[in-house]
Amino acid sequence: MSLDSRSREYREYVEAYLKDFYAQFHDAPQKDLYKAMEYSLLGGGKRLRPIFAFEFCRLCGRDWKDAAPFAAAVEMIHTYSLIHDDLPCMDNDDYRRGRLTNHKIFGEGMAVLAGDALLTDAFMVASKAKLARPEDMATAVGLMAECAGSPGMVGGQVLDIMSQERELSEQEVLDIQSRKTGALINAACALGAIAGGASDEQFEACLLYTSPSPRDMRRS
């Protein structure tokens, strides 16, 4: 099967996984929150991060579907970042992927909460992964937090905000992008390798492939 065909299958699988996960909450008292979350989460996108997670899992020798909890989790984190990035206090964007942004439909307060919930729910989903080495769950959670948090994606957004009034050097641009965009892609690849039961040698090779990262990522 070609990479294009596998990518299409990966994309469809993670879409179904995310829909199934949130279907259980449709009758919850806070259903308006879930509507806001699903509006952005299931509103299209290339699903590059899940594709990386699935492919690295496959390359390490296990059924690629074993990476589904991690693949879904990184897409949830990515979506939260887009919702918050579009807010008036950030980029103040009215449209995303050809549709009105989350806060334009549901209001700023609900958009903030939808992003917050996606970020925290991502860890709940990731915890469902069945790993060949259960001790790797601590590594996986640490990678997610590091790459999404202040050393990674959030830190990159801060640097982006701080730099808006001046011209950046090439190195500064690369640093921002490696954190704001690259860090979560790094995490997706590493999480896929973990789900695939990667040997220490395979895991190190994965880290070399995804370098640079906010800081060295190692197994616990």
Regions found by a protein language model. Name each.
Residues M1-I77, I83, C89-D91, R96-T101, ...:
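Conserved N-terminal diphosphate/IPP-binding helix and adjacent helical/loop segment
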Residues D63-M76, M137-L143, Q202-L208:
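Alpha-helical scaffolds flanking conserved acidic
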Residues Y209-D216:
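Conserved small/polar residues in nucleotide/adenosyl-binding loops
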Residues Y22, A117-L131, M144-S150, I185-A193:
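Histidine- and acidic-residue-rich, metal-dependent catalytic cores
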Residues A126, A140-S150, V154-V173, A187:
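Amphipathic alpha-helical interface segments
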Residues A126-A140, Q164-Q171, L191-E204:
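Inter-helical turn/loop segments and adjacent helix faces that build the functional surface
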Residues N92-A117, R166-A183:
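Divalent-cation-assisted or electrostatically stabilized phosphate/pyrophosphate-binding catalytic cores
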Residues F52, A122, G156:
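Residue-level signal for inorganic ion chemistry
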